[in-house]
Amino acid sequence: MKQYLDLCRRIVSEGEWVANERTGKHCLTVINADLEYDVANNQFPLITTRKSYWKAAIAEFLGYIRGYDNAADFRALGTKTWDANANVNAAWLANPHRRGVDDMGRVYGVQGRAWRKPNGETIDQLRKIVNNLTKGIDDRGEILTFFNPGEFDLGCLRPCMHTHTFSLVGDTLHLTSYQRSCDVPLGLNFNQIQVFTFLALMAQITGKKAGKAYHKIVNAHIYEDQLELMRDVQLKREPFPLPKLEINPDIKTLEDLETWVTMDDFKVVGYQSHEPIKYPFSV
């Protein structure tokens, strides 16, 4: 929690105002933030200075793992996080590539599981990584990326947390995740959970020990309509100890994640928090 709160304080005290064309709002912004999560000791980075809803974050990333491209599929997993971008985003609604209600286009998991080659064939990036790590192979290119500029016009949103690099040292697996932009009051809670859980899951299904997850953010910001709540409410609260994440040990393969796994297979233990804070969300 300390590193999260330190980043929030840094933005409030050192940030500069930057206009955001997509949302029409101004953001208090800092460049470059590095966070680290201790997955080995199960220090689950769930925000405690406001009530945080972890299930939607894991459900969303499970949808990425499955390569989903429709908000309805994400809702079925237990998260509504793509409803607005799929159905309210004005630019996407006017995009001729949009295929109707709930369509997200070629975003996130679609790129991770079916990256298009010039000849029309696709590459399953995640499958390659899982296969290599299971065999104890780290070719120093165990990289999953959702960032495909050639297909930005085919999706409702460019990826924010866009690239994940796995590193195997002995039998310990580490993860470095890269994020181009982060709405700190709302998005970072989600992203922290996802980085931590992704490493925990990948270690489990490849038979490796989980090590540390490193989270690198380029543009970390607080929107103008979020600042007062962050400065005058959340940063005034004392954090509680971090909880732990329990994952069903029967999850042993990528196929398990693709088929039968639900949110019932995850449990957070020992979570204490302050009252919720309703931060505005910018589409």
UniProtKB/Swiss-Prot annotation:
- Binding-site positions, dUMP: 22, 180-183, 191, 221-223
Per its UniProt record, what Pfam families does this chain match?
Answer: Thymidylat_synt
- Show the GO MF annotations: thymidylate synthase activity
EC number(s) per entry:
2.1.1.45
Q: Which SUPFAM superfamilies match?
A: Thymidylate synthase/dCMP hydroxymethylase
The answer to keyword Ribonucleoprotein applying to this record is no
Q: Which residues form the active site?
A: 160
Reactions performed catalytically: dUMP + (6R)-5,10-methylene-5,6,7,8-tetrahydrofolate = 7,8-dihydrofolate + dTMP
Can you name a GO cellular component term?
cytosol
Could you list this entry's UniProt keywords, alphabetically sorted.
Cytoplasm, Methyltransferase, Nucleotide biosynthesis, Transferase
Query: Where do the annotations place (6R)-5,10-methylene-5,6,7,8-tetrahydrofolate binding?
Result: 183, 282
What biological processes does GO assign it?
dTMP biosynthetic process; dTTP biosynthetic process; methylation
Pathway entry: Pyrimidine metabolism; dTTP biosynthesis
Q: Spell out the subcellular localization from the entry.
A: Cytoplasm
Spell out the subunit comment.
Homodimer.
Which PANTHER family does the entry mention? THYMIDYLATE SYNTHASE (PTHR11548:SF9), THYMIDYLATE SYNTHASE 1 (PTHR11548)
Q: What family does this chain come from, according to its entry?
A: Belongs to the thymidylate synthase family. Bacterial-type ThyA subfamily.
Role played: Catalyzes the reductive methylation of 2'-deoxyuridine-5'-monophosphate (dUMP) to 2'-deoxythymidine-5'-monophosphate (dTMP) while utilizing 5,10-methylenetetrahydrofolate (mTHF) as the methyl donor and reductant in the reaction, yielding dihydrofolate (DHF) as a by-product. This enzymatic reaction provides an intracellular de novo source of dTMP, an essential precursor for DNA biosynthesis.
Protein name as it appears in the record = Thymidylate synthase
Q: Which organism is it from?
A: Haemophilus influenzae (strain 86-028NP)
Q: Which gene encodes it?
A: thyA
